[in-house]
Amino acid sequence: CAWLMAFACALAWASDDYKIKVEVVQKGNAFHTQASFYLPLTLCQSYRYLTDYDAATNIAGVVASTTTRIDARTARVERLIQERILFFPIKMRMVMEFTELPNLGTDFVQISGEAKYYKGAWRLESEGNGTVFKYRTESEPDSFLPKAVIEYFIKNRLNSSFETIAKMGAERVKQPC
């Protein structure tokens, strides 16, 4: 029983250790999202993780992710996402273009997909013995989804998605740069 308690406490501590923060503000039909988390990775390791676009298939709902290099600092990523939100089955396809800023982050914009628009950035900031990942987006979902469904997804899935992203990144602590 003591081992079970210790394990549960270790899991709770590990989750808090990422210092995950997520904030979503709706302005009209657009959603502005800001999120951040901390990982014990160097800037170089963090940048390599950030630009491993196809690792997203380990996040719940991301069924496929295919990356095509446009040039040395630009990547086009096509993703297929399937979710069940409340009782609604949702299938979305998007094509994103990422502009890479070595060891600083990425800028991205949806060039085709289900949202009216989706754009944002990841930024990396060295802090102590690790890196803070900062995410910000502006998006306007297509109106084919009921507003309540969109709000449910944003409020209930974003935290768990960022927690998964942080856990996957933390597993790369021993990978060379």
Question: What do these predicted ranges mean?
Answer:
Residues 43, 47-53, 121, 155, ...:
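Extracytoplasmic/secreted envelope proteins and their assembly/folding machinery
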Residues 7-9:
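N-terminal signal peptide c-region/cleavage motif recognized by signal peptidases
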Residues 110-156, 160:
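Beta-strand/loop substructures that line and gate deep hydrophobic ligand-binding cavities in soluble
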Residues 1-4:
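Bacterial N-terminal signal peptides that target proteins for export
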Residues 18, 31-35, 92-94, 118-120, ...:
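One face of beta-strands
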Residues 11-72:
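Hydrophobic ligand-binding cavity/cleft-lining segments
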Residues 23, 66-67, 97, 119-123:
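Short, surface-exposed charged micro-motifs
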Residues 27-30, 38, 57, 61, ...:
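Glycine-rich portal/gate segments that line the openings of hydrophobic small-molecule binding cavities
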